[in-house]
Design a protein with these regions (language model features):
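Bacterial N-terminal signal peptides
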Residues: 8-16
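OB-fold and OB-like single-stranded nucleic-acid-recognition modules
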Residues: 18-118
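Bacterial N-terminal signal peptides that target proteins for export
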Residues: 1-8
Length: 118
């Protein structure tokens, strides 16, 4: 009897852990309400820009400067992205911690695995 009770409690704890680890998914417009969360932002990339310093910006929810959200790829990580223009016009899922930069939400992307084309 104790074994069955323990097994049932273990299965419940395991299920609760799996649910807790599932990341929330938001649109570009919703991201600003979830600053500080580790989440996934899924939306269409409306513009891709690479700065003279090598930083890459994927603007979602509108074109710069009216975008709702930005996936920022620092120049130190940009080498992992051989063709950032491939994201333009496509729906992507960007995962990481949502932060604010100049009043707009962003996720800093340091690994190619953080962006998935849907």
């Amino acid at each position: 009897m104790k074994t069955k009770t323990f097994l049932a409690l273990f299965v419940c704890a395991l299920a609760a852990s799996a649910i807790a680890q599932a990341r929330a998914t938001y649109t570009a417009a919703e991201a600003a309400k979830h600053v500080g969360e580790i989440a996934t932002v899924t939306d269409r990339v409306d513009g891709v820009h690479q700065s003279s310093k090598g930083n890459i910006f994927l603007n979602m929810g509108g074109k710069y400067p009216n975008q709702a959200f930005t996936a920022w790829i620092p120049s130190a990580s940009a080498g992992q992205f051989s063709n950032p223009q491939q994201y333009e016009g496509k729906t992507v899922a960007v995962s990481g911690k949502i932060t604010l930069y100049r009043g707009k939400p962003e996720i800093i992307v340091t690994n190619v695995s953080q962006i998935i084309i849907k």
